[in-house]
Amino acid sequence: MTKPKVIFFGNGLLAETVFDTLKDNVEIIFCAKKKEDLEQTIQIMKNKEQKVYGVLASFGVIIPNSVLELFEPEGIINVHPSYLPDLRGPSPIETAILRGDTEFGVSVMKLVEKMDAGPIYYQEKIAMDKFAQKSEIYERLGECGGKWVAENLTQLPKPVEQNGEATYSKMLDTKMARLRPAEQTAEEMLDQIRAFMHFPKTRIEVKGLDCIVLSAHLSNEPEPIKGHTELSLKGKDGLYLIIDEIQPAGKKAMGAAAFANGYLK
């Protein structure tokens, strides 16, 4: 049986998982990873001799109608990691982690020019462990959405318009990255570390040294290292965030004990 031909749009963690889930079930004839690849996409679609589908996951660029129209009637199929219309925008997983969610959604939708506003082909909610790592959440949602696309691409149901009030996620930037123990609970700080892993990376200043916080855990009390409590951050709720792994600016990542030995003397 001939595999359906696909142009794949995307880059980053979600795109990698969706691509890997799709690749054995479809023939991917071109990967568009950036805006400049859209021109080649147009040429392929104008010169095609067989049906070509478009599948997108985390492309990061608004695709104009002039390109979307080339893939009608199905349109470009977008795998978006939220239960739309909740958390449209560029950082749905990170925003869901920051607000303490333990249930995450994935939506397979028809792409339209307005951001994440297209009709829905398929949606699913997935429960995750309370402190699941961001990479695990990306993988689970990408596999779920990619598997559905692989199984249904050539026989898509009629999409249904989104229902309910839309909420939005924001573009992540380094201004969000710094921990604020006086303003955050210990759990909120831990959620921030999980959400900002890879980018923009959670930061804190320890004895004048700018550091990236890589992992931590919660505790009811401080956990001194050789008498030092700088890596035990008291949240506004009275609980503590205990830093387990840290990376001083310009240095390699290290465990809390190694950091204390080298910098907390």
Language-model features: locations:
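C-terminal active-site/capping subdomain that shapes the small-molecule cofactor and substrate pocket
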Residues: 190-265
